[in-house]
């Protein structure tokens, strides 16, 4: 890949991470709750760079995976409907035991807080 391509991808990932940070802040404000982790599922969970940037920007761990979350969710709902799984807790326990999830711990959060503050000062919300 070219340097330009890599720069564009990095710009997109940084923007997404800062948008996630802003969204997390808004959700926390609206609910009055503090969140201890983010679960990133689907295609974005395949990007180590995006996952690490999100952990750094939000200052909390990111649990990445499963990539095929829609398929797993659909399967669990069908198993619930058929009575093969007794409740949502059991479905979640089955998934936790069956799916590999990678954890990204936050680092260098101060730099990300400064970038987020600069975005707010410039009127950028997401």
Language model regions located:
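Short, amphipathic alpha-helical "lid/cap" segments that border enzyme active or binding sites
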Residues: 13, 17, 72, 112-120
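Internal hydrophobic alpha-helix adjacent to the cofactor/substrate pocket in enzyme cavities
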Residues: 20, 79-84
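Short, small-residue alpha-helix embedded
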Residues: 71-80
């Amino acid at each position: 890949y070219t340097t330009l391509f890599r720069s564009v991808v990095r710009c997109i990932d940084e923007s997404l991470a800062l948008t996630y940070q802003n969204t997390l802040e808004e959700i926390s404000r609206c609910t009055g709750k503090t969140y201890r982790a983010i679960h990133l599922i689907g295609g974005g969970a395949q990007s180590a760079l995006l996952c690490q940037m999100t952990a750094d920007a939000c200052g909390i761990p990111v649990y990445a995976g499963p990539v095929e979350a829609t398929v797993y969710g659909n399967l669990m709902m069908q198993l619930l409907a058929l009575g093969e799984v007794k409740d949502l807790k059991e479905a979640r326990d089955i998934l936790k035991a069956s799916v590999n999830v990678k954890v990204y711990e936050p680092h260098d959060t101060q730099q990300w807080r400064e970038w987020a503050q600069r975005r707010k000062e410039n009127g950028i919300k997401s």
